[in-house]
Swiss-Prot record:
Keyword tags: Lyase
Catalytic residues as annotated in Swiss-Prot or TrEMBL: R88, E91, S114
Similarity annotation: Belongs to the cyanase family.
One of the protein's GO biological processes: cyanate metabolic process
Record's protein name: Cyanate hydratase
UniProt cross-references to CDD domains, sorted A to Z: Cyanase_C, HTH_XRE
A matching Pfam family: Cyanate_lyase
Keyword Nucleus: no
Species the sequence originates in: Acaryochloris marina (strain MBIC 11017)
Length: 147
């Protein structure tokens, strides 16, 4: 995955300060996954949010402005991810994508789930057989227009 220079700076500062995305959520007032998407340049922040991020990381104020610019979303390379965790999501969509699409169409009709009017949350669910990862996606349903 190609990582932008600013992302490298933000992540290095985050590591050096020992700050988690959850810590940044409390400081910025936005969900930790959304903050991670700003840092990885897949979302843009308001000026106030960007300033809170760079201040919390102890970085120069001029690094806030680039975080407010709408990024080129979905531009991570290569097309098929090689990172094992990211690949699992690719694999999940390969296996369950068409069945999930069929269920969505059955419940809502012909359309798509928005990735703009959208949220995603990651939670840890304790389990005696090994902790589980719970990912909840919530997107507005957008029916296809007929004309």
């Amino acid at each position: 995955m190609a990582i932008a220079e600013i992302t490298e700076k933000l992540l290095a500062a985050k590591k050096a300060k020992g700050i988690s995305f959850e810590d940044l959520e409390k400081i910025v007032g936005c969900d930790e996954t959304w903050i991670a998407s700003v840092i990885y340049r897949q979302a843009s922040a308001s000026t106030e949010e960007a300033e809170k991020i760079v201040t919390a990381l102890g970085l120069p104020a001029e690094l806030a402005e680039p975080l407010t610019v709408p990024p080129m979303k979905g531009s991570l390379e290569p097309v098929i991810p090689t990172d094992p965790l990211v690949y699992r999501f690719y694999e999940i969509m390969q296996v369950y994508g068409v069945p999930v699409k069929a269920v969505i169409h059955e419940k809502f009709g012909d359309g798509i789930m928005s990735a703009i009017d959208f949220s995603i949350e990651v939670d840890k669910v304790p389990d005696p057989k090994g902790d589980r990862v719970q990912v909840t996606m919530c997107g507005k349903f957008l029916p296809y227009k007929k004309w």
